[in-house]
Amino acid sequence: MTDARVLHVDIRPWSDGDLPLLERLLGDPAMMTYLGGPESPAKIRERHARYCRPSDTARVFAVVVGPERQAVGWVGLWEKEVRGQRVWETGWSVLPESQGQGIGARATAIVLERARAEGRYQFIHAFPSVENAPSNAICRKLGFTLHEEGDFEYPPGHMMRCNDWRLDLRAPVEKARR
């Protein structure tokens, strides 16, 4: 894959044809190291069906790269209540062969721009595992502030130690998509 500085990164709505991508992302033990392990085929199909039905409160996009718009991951945002306040939460996942090229950061920056333009909530949060250095680096690069470290239940029934990164969507925009 080409370097992300010259590689075009974009997002598009999640579609029925993205199930094999989701199976690779969520069914791979290495990809799910920080998230409680791989999901079962039934859970992946259930999640895929949800991803195909965007709503005002949750949207998932395929991350696409290059002129051929090859799907290499997902990025999304959904409503969450944090300390009694409604906010956006964001998350992302990129295939191993496409990691380390800035693709996840650039795709997440696009989602942040959309959330900012929508103006619904002041804050967007991300909750990567404290051990997930690449995802924590994306938060830092995109201008999130480390709010606190805490325990987070994900998936249901599995507690993980995570960082609560927060970005003020109403603050002046930094040049995060360099």
Positions of the model-derived regions?
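Acyl-donor (CoA/ACP) binding surface of acyl/acetyltransferases
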Residues: 1-27, 34, 60, 64-178
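Conserved GNAT-fold acetyl-CoA-binding loop/helix
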Residues: 30-50
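Juxtamembrane/interface motifs at transmembrane-helix termini
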Residues: 41-45, 53-55, 66, 94
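A short helix-loop-beta-strand connector motif used in the catalytic cores of GNAT acetyltransferases and
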Residues: 50-62
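Short, charged/polar low-complexity linear motifs in solvent-exposed/disordered segments
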Residues: 39-41, 50-52, 89-91, 165
